[in-house]
């Protein structure tokens, strides 16, 4: 265990397996995955959900506000205009935040499904692929009718086992079934119902499914018939028989001009009925007929037979037929590297070369092969040796066997030239490049490409083809470069984690048949996932059953599925039990401490960012604390970082494998490999991995365990109940004379088992009682196999273990990944799966090492699962994934056992564990070893063991009737034909690094900050931007001289690292709210709104790329603002009285951070930030007048001008100098300026400005304010506001006269001394400030300045803060705006750049400009706080002509769809 993995793991996996899996584990970026196909996603998912159920995963294609899908449609209730608007908003969001995660709902909630594409909207290649398959099946059907094959009459010598098998298989099929197979090509025709002469009973159901049930009197008769149709073509084993002469005819129903194609005699004697069907299935898809093989490019197919059904034999038989009867010359077989030798041995056994046969061999008994089998394995280490093998294969023909990794290296240019990057020492001498060698390498590359890809072989065969689960992985890309369309995928588990992996595999053998990933996700993935869980709605369940059947029927022509039911009739019984194990005290303490740390850090630490490593650490805990203790002692090795962070960030789970020649890098490598299929996992998406996270956070640390393991005693078996039960199972099995296998993902766990074995004695098997006791000794009494075991050593160990005469070796320790493929261990009949794998197929493949042809004894499987831990959750997800596979691939109806929340909430932590049981009920346990374990160790088992398959029982009562199947297909066709096409831009999986400064805090170190979060807090990846109503929030008075850090850090309950953040360059400000703030949730009835109560202290955190509100209980909300200002019902527009940062400009009301800055020839001083000392100083000068303006607002005349509801401010208001509502697209760090001065250091010269809303009045205003109030009451009444329908979102405090750019803007402009400049003339109706903050002066009152001539106060709506300069399209410097009598269609701004509060005095504004210089006489002069209108020519920014075209209008119709929105991210 010297090579600890960087994730804190152990030498845990097999480098051999990792080498061949390296490219497979290169999962593509979530974004690419979503585009190319996974979307949600779910993404997932799905993870999860699922990894599989990620489903994920998959919100990219769905609209979260839509209605639940119905049985006949997956459309939403959104109207077309609504969808167009959302599409437009999606584009804006995508441009603003291309990495934003698309999934908005909590991962455990059901997804809504977009409308399906119309059939005519499908890609042309998709329609062509489906049409080709339809024509192929029609041709085959026509051949069956024209050249019907006779029913084989099987002689008795060929029938002994078949007769026995079928006798136990149930009732015989009716005679009419024996005629021939019939494939239904079109179910949309209504003629079938008319031709039916049978009576149909229409049953009106009042149950939860309000649909029409048609009960056909013949349905019950055809139940068995339906069973036979499930797996595709050639699955009726009654027809899959030898003829009277013992021959096997391959080309059934062939035209008379074609010859009969028979299997070789030795193969015909060996194949089983289901294998005959598989060979015929391969022939129909790849050859079809001898004539068409010469003229067509052929088709691909998937042979999806379960493990142990002899797929290798079927392929070898088909290859022999292919070479004998067709012009095919080359076949490429790409297989897992550790099965290469097995494939070669199978070829030599079933089709021996001529030289291997005796001289007196009779061809009618054994027919030798006439083609060569070439192999590329680890013996060919140089390019020259590989090129020689390749050249021999191309010239001589035959079969070439190679591993996946070898194929990837030889076909991808990037990997060929450089290989996997390796760390090299700095050379002290210059590097010499051999140009001749470079030329040779390039020549090799061209030859490889020609042989393998262009044109490539005639047929490609991919064993364990479920590796093609990611269309963006390099191996998948390399395989898709092959030009041959005759592609075969062999897999026992076509659907492992999620439907998208299934789609990737189908898309390889039949490109474009299921459409794009988006089309497939919409039509099948999300409807099927929505109905998978026990809390799905009845409509979800029904739609899921319908769509599962439709998908199964679509693929049955080229996907042949045969399950373990075939094995059950040939093999002894198999019993698979799950034992839920309790944690010991030290394990529970460690696990509790670990989960507490996770909940405290949320997604900010390495655990939240890298769930793989969290799983690895947990695996150390529940397997045995000694493993964790060993890792803690070697923590320096654990920090070597064996997971590629960049790869992990892009893929979600992909783990890099160590280069060849290095020892396996521990448990992380192992688990990462085993979890590599979790690309779509909602588990991974839900915790929100930040790809820009600092590298240090991705290093596993064990400091949290140091205290608990200070006085830990190693070598105590009882510290792990799992280990106690394991040794009980081993010893009791040996006593019964049974050999046993032990599978674990962790190499360090296998090493620990070896340590405990060395201290114990081998039990006495039957018949050896008199012999002396012996210790367990490796390679004598037990074997071990992992990825580091050489291929030749593997074969020796396996053969020796399976030898019946070997009575000394009773135990075989295997790593799950290395030992689950290409290993036949029928010498054992008991298996212990020590830890649950992420991918259910790995554990299932481990089981199939013993339960396969050749097994003579009953098999017993024991799965040990740590209860009340993450492992139990992973096991639950295995059941869900397997259930989905049964439903889609096998067309079964497994029971729904878990809610989606149970399945997807992997990090759920149960604090209270039930008390140990005194005894367990063992009446239902028949197996003696397990029964004894329950009697001996009831305190170590949480509940009675149960059968694994009991959770996957097929509910035959839920099977679709023929009428329902017909309805399912019709509804699918109708959905394709009638729904409106809709495409939505892709959203990236993760946020950009806007919160990098926050998440860079190492949360798992005792030396750093450990925030306190709520116990029930769960990480949430993102929340969909929602519409929100502005909510009032006024800052409370902060004591004079309080600084940001002191104000924020004086409250110990906050426990917030202010200094840490400030050193990182993050602005932190503490604010006390004076009114309740509701954080809007999603637009659905099930979401509960969060609330920030009045009087609560919150922190406003503004980094370089984002602004956040942190509440006192630790929740963090990200603030976003997009869209146009909202139009109130009364036609007025509310705007906050602040402005965006000075560095941002406005393009016709649209925020554009990239717009060119206006030149400042006079070098005007610009504020660095909105909260700069200059602005704060200016604000303090008006503290006296604030109360005066506030008091005056309470007069009746003032209130009359405020017809709207009380002022409401965006709940995102948090950081000074920003605005929501003034600029339709505002940056992430822009918040309302109402909090401008709160918490800022003010110095000693000026009192702190107390800014309050009209609900909080000063009890006794100062005398200065009283006098100001008396003066203000002499002002004029407000002028009525003129309606203005078409306007420009002018972000300024000045009225915009009629604009000549639009002929509709013809309202005459009249300037009256008493009119309010903000609401006069043709000001846009949606830009009136009175409704957003009531009267803007209540926030930042304006007073006369001694330097500026005062004018009469106009009204209660007098000028407030200027939000930004006029749009640049309105600032044409060629117009002489300072001429007294020259009429302009619009006013020029006072400043050439946005100022914080333009009404306040500025040295730029000359106080002695005459009123005659105004654009309109008297336009600006009557208003207090404004200088006379006019602007120096030099201050006008250059006219930006290209922005004129971006003018947009707003209407009241958009008020509920095109509003300022806040994106709230709860952490």
UniProtKB/Swiss-Prot annotation:
Question: Where in the chain is the Glycyl lysine isopeptide (Lys-Gly) (interchain with G-Cter in SUMO2) cross-link?
Answer: 115, 127, 272, 665, 682, 759, 901, 1014, 1018
The protein's matches in SMART domains, at most eight in alphabetical order, are given as: DEXDc (SM00487), HELICc (SM00490)
Residue runs in coiled coils: none
Which residue intervals are annotated with compositional bias (Basic and acidic residues) in the record?
133-147, 192-201
- Which intervals of this chain are the motif DEAH box? 463-466
> Where is this chain's protein located in or outside the cell?
Nucleus
Q: Which residues form the Helicase C-terminal domain?
A: 728-896
Activity control, per UniProt: Enzyme activity is enhanced by dsDNA (double-stranded DNA) and ssDNA (single-stranded DNA).
Which keywords accompany this UniProt record? ATP-binding, DNA-binding, Helicase, Hydrolase, Isopeptide bond, Nucleotide-binding, Nucleus, Phosphoprotein, Repeat, Ubl conjugation
Q: Which GO terms describe its cellular component?
A: nucleus
Spell out the post-translational modification annotation for this entry: Sumoylated.
Where the record places motif LXXLL motif 1 is: 551-555
Disulfide-bonded cysteines: none
Positions contributing to ATP binding: 305-312
Residues recorded as bearing Phosphothreonine in the entry? 1260
- Ranges where the record places region Disordered: 1-150, 186-234, 649-673, 1120-1171, 1184-1221, 1247-1284, 1445-1467
| Motif mapping: LXXLL motif 2 | 1329-1333
Query: In which family does this protein belong, per the annotation?
Result: Belongs to the SNF2/RAD54 helicase family.
Domain remarks in the Swiss-Prot or TrEMBL record: Leu-Xaa-Xaa-Leu-Leu (LXXLL) motifs are known to be important for the association with nuclear receptors.
Name recorded for this polypeptide: Helicase ARIP4
Gene encoding the protein: RAD54L2
């Amino acid at each position: 265990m010297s090579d600890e993995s960087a994730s804190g793991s152990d030498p845990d996996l097999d480098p051999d397996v990792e080498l061949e899996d390296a490219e497979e584990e290169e999962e593509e970026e979530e974004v690419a995955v979503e585009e190319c196909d996974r979307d949600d996603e779910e993404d997932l998912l799905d993870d999860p959900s699922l990894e599989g159920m990620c489903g994920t995963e998959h919100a990219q294609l769905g609209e979260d506000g839509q209605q639940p899908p119905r049985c006949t449609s997956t459309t939403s209730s959104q109207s077309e205009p609504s969808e167009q608007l959302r599409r437009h908003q999606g584009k804006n969001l995508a441009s603003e935040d291309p990495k934003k995660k698309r999934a908005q709902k909590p991962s455990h909630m059901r997804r809504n499904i977009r409308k399906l594409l119309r059939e005519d909207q499908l890609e042309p290649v998709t329609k062509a692929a489906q049409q080709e398959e339809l024509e192929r099946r029609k041709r085959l059907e026509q051949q069956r009718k024209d050249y019907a094959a006779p029913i084989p009459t099987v002689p008795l010598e060929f029938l002994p086992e078949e007769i026995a098998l079928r006798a136990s298989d149930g009732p015989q099929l009716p005679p009419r079934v024996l005629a021939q197979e019939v494939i239904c090509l079109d179910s949309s025709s209504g003629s079938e119902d008319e031709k039916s002469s049978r009576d149909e009973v229409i049953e009106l159901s009042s149950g939860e499914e309000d649909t029409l049930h048609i009960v056909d009197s013949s349905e019950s008769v055809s139940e068995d018939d339906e069973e036979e149709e499930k797996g595709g073509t050639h699955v009726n084993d009654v027809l899959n028989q030898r003829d009277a002469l013992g021959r096997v005819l391959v080309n059934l129903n062939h035209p008379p001009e074609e010859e009969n194609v028979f299997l070789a005699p030795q193969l015909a004697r060996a194949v089983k009925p289901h294998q005959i069907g598989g060979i015929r299935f391969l022939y129909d898809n790849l050859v079809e007929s001898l004539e068409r093989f010469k003229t067509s490019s052929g088709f691909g197919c998937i042979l999806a037979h379960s493990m142990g059904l002899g797929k290798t034999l079927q392929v070898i038989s088909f290859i022999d037929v292919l070479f004998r009867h067709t012009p095919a010359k080359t076949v490429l077989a790409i297989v897992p590297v550790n099965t290469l030798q097995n494939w070669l041995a199978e070829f030599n056994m079933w089709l021996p070369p001529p030289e291997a046969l005796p001289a007196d061999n009779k061809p009618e008994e054994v027919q030798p092969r006439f083609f060569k089998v070439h192999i590329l394995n680890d013996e060919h280490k140089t390019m020259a040796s590989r090129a020689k093998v390749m050249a021999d294969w191309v010239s001589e023909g035959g079969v070439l066997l190679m591993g996946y990794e070898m194929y990837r290296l030889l076909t991808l240019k990037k990997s060929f030239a450089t290989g996997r990057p390796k760390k090299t020492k700095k050379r002290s001498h210059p590097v010499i490049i051999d140009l001749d060698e470079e030329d040779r390498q390039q020549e090799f590359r061209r030859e490889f490409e020609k042989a393998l890809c262009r044109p490539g072989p005639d047929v490609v065969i991919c064993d364990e083809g479920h590796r093609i689960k990611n269309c963006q992985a390099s191996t998948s890309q390399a395989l898709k470069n092959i030009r041959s369309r005759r592609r075969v995928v062999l897999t026992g588990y076509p659907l492992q984690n999620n439907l998208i992996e299934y789609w990737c595999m189908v898309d390889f053998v039949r490109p474009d048949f299921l459409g794009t990933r988006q089309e497939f996700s919409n039509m099948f993935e999300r409807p099927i996932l929505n109905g998978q869980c026990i809390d799905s709605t009845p409509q979800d369940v029904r739609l899921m059953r319908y769509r599962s059947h439709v998908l199964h029927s679509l693929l049955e022509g080229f996907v042949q599925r045969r399950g373990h039911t075939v094995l059950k009739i040939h093999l002894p019984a198999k019993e698979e039990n799950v034992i839920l194990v309790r944690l010991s005290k030290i394990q529970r303490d460690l696990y509790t401490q670990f989960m507490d740390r996770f909940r405290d850090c949320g997604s900010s630490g390495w655990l939240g960012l890298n769930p793989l490593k969290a799983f690895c650490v947990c695996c150390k805990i529940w397997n045995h604390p000694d493993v964790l203790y060993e890792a803690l002692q070697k923590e320096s090795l654990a920090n070597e970082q064996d997971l590629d962070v960049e790869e992990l960030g892009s893929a979600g789970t992909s783990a890099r494998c160590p280069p060849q020649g290095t020892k396996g890098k521990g448990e992380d490598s192992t688990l990462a490999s085993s979890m590599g299929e979790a690309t779509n996992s909602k588990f991974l998406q839900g915790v929100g991995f930040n790809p820009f996270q600092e590298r240090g956070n991705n290093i596993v640390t064990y400091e949290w365990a140091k205290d608990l393991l200070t006085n830990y005693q190693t070598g105590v078996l009882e510290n792990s109940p799992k280990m106690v039960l394991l040794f009980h199972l081993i010893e009791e099995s040996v006593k019964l004379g049974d050999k046993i296998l032990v599978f674990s993902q962790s190499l360090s766990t296998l090493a620990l088992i070896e340590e405990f074995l060395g201290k114990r004695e081998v039990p006495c098997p039957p018949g050896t009682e008199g012999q002396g006791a012996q210790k367990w000794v490796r390679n004598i009494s037990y074997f071990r196999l992992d990825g580091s075991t050489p291929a030749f050593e593997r074969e020796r160990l396996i053969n020796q273990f399976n030898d019946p005469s070997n009575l000394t070796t009773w135990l075989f320790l295997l790593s799950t990944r290395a030992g689950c493929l290409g290993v036949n261990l029928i010498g054992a009949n008991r298996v212990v799966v020590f830890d649950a794998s992420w991918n259910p197929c790995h554990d299932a493949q481990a089981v199939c090492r013993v339960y396969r042809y050749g097994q003579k004894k009953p098999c017993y499987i024991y799965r040990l699962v740590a209860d009340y831990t993450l492992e139990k959750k992973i096991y639950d997800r295995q059941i869900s994934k397997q259930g989905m596979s049964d439903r889609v691939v096998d067309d079964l109806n497994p029971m729904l056992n878990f809610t989606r929340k149970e399945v997807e909430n992997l990090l759920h932590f149960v604090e209270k564990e039930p008390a140990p049981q005194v005894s367990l009920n063992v009446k239902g346990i028949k197996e003696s070893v397990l029964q004894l374990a329950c009697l001996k160790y009831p305190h170590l088992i949480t509940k009675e063991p149960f059968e694994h398959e009991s959770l996957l029982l097929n509910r035959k009562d839920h099977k679709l009737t023929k009428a329902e199947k017909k309805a399912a297909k019709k509804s699918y066709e109708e959905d394709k034909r009638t729904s409106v096409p809709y495409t939505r831009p892709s959203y990236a999986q993760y946020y950009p690094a806007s919160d990098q400064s926050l998440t860079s805090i190492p949360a798992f170190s005792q030396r750093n900050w450990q925030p306190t979060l709520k116990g029930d807090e769960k990480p949430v990846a993102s929340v969909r931007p929602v519409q929100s109503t502005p909510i009032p929030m006024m800052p409370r008075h902060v004591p004079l001289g309080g600084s940001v850090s002191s104000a924020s850090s004086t409250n110990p309950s906050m426990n917030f690292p202010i200094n840490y953040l400030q050193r990182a360059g993050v602005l932190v400000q503490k604010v006390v709210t004076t009114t309740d703030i509701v954080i809007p949730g999603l637009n659905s009835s099930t979401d509960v709104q969060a609330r920030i109560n009045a009087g609560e202290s919150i922190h406003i955190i503004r980094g370089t790329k984002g602004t956040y509100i942190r509440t006192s209980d630790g929740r963090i909300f990200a603030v976003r603002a997009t869209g146009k200002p909202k139009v109130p019902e009364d036609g007025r527009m509310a705007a906050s009285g602040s402005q965006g940062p000075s560095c941002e400009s406005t393009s016709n009301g649209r925020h554009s951070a990239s717009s060119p800055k206006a030149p400042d020839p006079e070098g005007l001083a610009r504020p660095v930030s909105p909260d700069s000392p200059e602005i704060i100083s200016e604000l303090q000068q008006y503290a006296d007048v604030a109360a005066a303006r506030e008091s005056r607002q309470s007069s009746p005349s003032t209130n009359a001008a405020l017809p709207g509801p009380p002022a409401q401010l965006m709940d995102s208001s948090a950081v000074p100098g920003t605005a929501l509502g003034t600029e339709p697209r505002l940056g992430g760090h822009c918040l309302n300026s109402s909090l401008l001065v709160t918490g800022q250091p003010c110095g000693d010269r000026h009192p702190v400005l107390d800014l309050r809303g009209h609900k909080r009045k000063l009890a006794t205003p100062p005398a200065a304010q009283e006098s100001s109030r008396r003066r203000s009451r002499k002002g004029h009444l407000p002028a009525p506001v003129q309606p203005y329908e078409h306007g420009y979102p002018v972000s300024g405090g000045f009225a915009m006269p009629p604009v000549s750019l639009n002929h509709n803007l013809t309202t005459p402009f009249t300037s009256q001394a008493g009119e309010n400049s903000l609401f006069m003339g043709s000001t846009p109706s949606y830009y009136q400030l009175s409704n957003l903050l009531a009267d803007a002066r209540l926030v930042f009152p304006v007073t006369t300045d001694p330097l500026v001539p005062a004018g009469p106060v106009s009204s209660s709506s007098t000028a407030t803060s200027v939000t930004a300069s006029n749009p640049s399209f309105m600032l044409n410097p060629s117009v002489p705006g300072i001429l007294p009598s020259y009429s302009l269609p619009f006013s020029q701004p006072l400043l050439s750049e946005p100022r914080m509060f333009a009404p306040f005095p500025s040295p730029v504004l000359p106080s002695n400009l005459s009123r005659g210089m105004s654009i309109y006489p008297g336009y600006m002069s009557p208003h207090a706080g404004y200088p006379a209108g006019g602007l120096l020519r030099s201050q006008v920014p250059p006219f930006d002509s290209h922005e004129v075209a971006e003018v947009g209008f707003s209407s009241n119709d958009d008020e509920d769809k095109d509003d300022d929105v806040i994106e709230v991210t709860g952490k």
